Amino acid sequence: MKKNIKIATLVALLGVFVACSSESTPTYSELGSENYPQKFYVEYIPCNYGADWSPEAFNEDMLPGWQELLVEVDSKVVGAYGLVYENKPEDAQEDGFWQLVWNSKADAEEGWSTWEGYDKATEWNESTATILACGDKEDTFSFDAYVRRDFNSQGEFDAENFASDYQACSYNEGQGSQELISVIDDFEAWLDSENNLISQPYGYMVLAPDYETDEFDFIWGNFNQTAESRVLANENFLENGIIRFLVSSIAE
């Protein structure tokens, strides 16, 4: 039975590992396209520090081998990030997550099948577990991800180190994905208005769980360059009440 993912503030401490419309039938673009909205697949693998953990050990002794294996198996993974808690919840069993980004669920399933059937990948997992031990496919939290705008539209992100926070939401009675798209339409209009005072990189995405859970219907993720800029952005949101007002109309 899959445990619940902890919703909290996460920071991309380890850096980059690898180099919606209101219509009833919206079209989506793949990651890397200049067209939006984009729809893709995101996975969060729970990880725990080993006895030999350090950022240096990860970057020098663990990461290069993983990157080489990705080339060997011709992986379709688009990107990967290491996420750690800014303030770890007391009941969190993991120290952080290894985030994988794919263009589709089919690519993810193919990638996992190839990886788990590759002996050298198994050897790498075992040999690096004292640095960082991560779960397998069964432990992974998978989501359909939706992004309306370029993350660099409010300023260019440094993808090697940023701050993110995730809010779990449940639909109010009679509400669903179409109403959520309408909320996003209104939020987009607000972001482009003079009421938006965000002057630093900011992006957001919406995640729909691709696994059984009664805890929430979707997750709203906000991304800022630093924890300090996140505080300023949140103050802007609170002052205008924009996200809480819009989302609370369909979810809680």
What label would you give each PLM region?
Residues 1-9:
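Bacterial N-terminal signal peptides that target proteins for export
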Residues 16-19:
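C-terminal motif of bacterial Sec signal peptides marking the signal peptidase cleavage site
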